[in-house]
């Protein structure tokens, strides 16, 4: 599971997920990419589930890049605990996703196979996605 090795602070405030992704919005490593068109947060488990779906579908062929990293800790209080008494403990890590962010990239496989693999991975996410190709400038 992806998570930071060390952080400056153990817990963070909730914050707001606004705006569009400008960094990481282009396919820069592979030939094809899976780009988010919706906004939300993706957990480390969902990122791993998507990676597994892609890897299994392409039968371990080609090269895959994961372009998102879960760097925000999410805290939860245990069940049946009253409010107050401080912030809960860190339960899982998420990556905040803005529209336009490229989530995965792949090369070394056909476009049809890449589309099928990314469709399988997209089913694991709570955000809407689209298939994109690398544009040569």
UniProtKB/Swiss-Prot annotation:
- Name the UniProt key words of this record, in alphabetical order: Ribonucleoprotein, Ribosomal protein, RNA-binding, rRNA-binding, tRNA-binding
Q: GO CC: one term?
A: cytosolic large ribosomal subunit
* Keyword hit for Ribosomal protein: yes
PROSITE patterns xref list: RIBOSOMAL_L16_1 (PS00586), RIBOSOMAL_L16_2 (PS00701)
- Mind telling me which CDD domains this protein's record contains? Ribosomal_L16_L10e (cd01433)
Q: Where is this region: Disordered?
A: 1-22
Q: How does it assemble?
A: Part of the 50S ribosomal subunit.
Q: Show the HAMAP family listed in the entry.
A: Ribosomal_uL16
**NCBIfam families tied to this protein:** rplP_bact
Q: Which PANTHER family match?
A: 50S/60S RIBOSOMAL PROTEIN L16, LARGE RIBOSOMAL SUBUNIT PROTEIN UL16M
Protein known as: Large ribosomal subunit protein uL16
Q: Report the gene name.
A: rplP
């Amino acid at each position: 599971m992806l998570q930071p090795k060390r952080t400056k602070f153990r817990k963070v405030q909730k914050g707001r997920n606004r705006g569009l992704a400008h960094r990481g919005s282009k396919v820069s490593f592979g030939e094809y990419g899976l780009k988010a068109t919706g906004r939300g947060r993706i957990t480390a488990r969902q990122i791993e589930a998507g990676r597994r779906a892609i890897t299994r579908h392409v039968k371990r062929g080609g090269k895959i890049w994961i372009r998102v990293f879960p760097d925000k800790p999410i805290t939860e209080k245990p069940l049946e605990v009253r409010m107050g008494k401080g912030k809960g403990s860190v339960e899982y890590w998420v990556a905040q996703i803005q529209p336009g962010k490229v989530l995965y990239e792949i090369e070394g496989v056909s476009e049809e196979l890449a589309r099928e693999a990314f469709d399988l991975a997209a089913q694991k996410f709570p955000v809407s996605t689209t298939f994109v190709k690398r544009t040569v400038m």
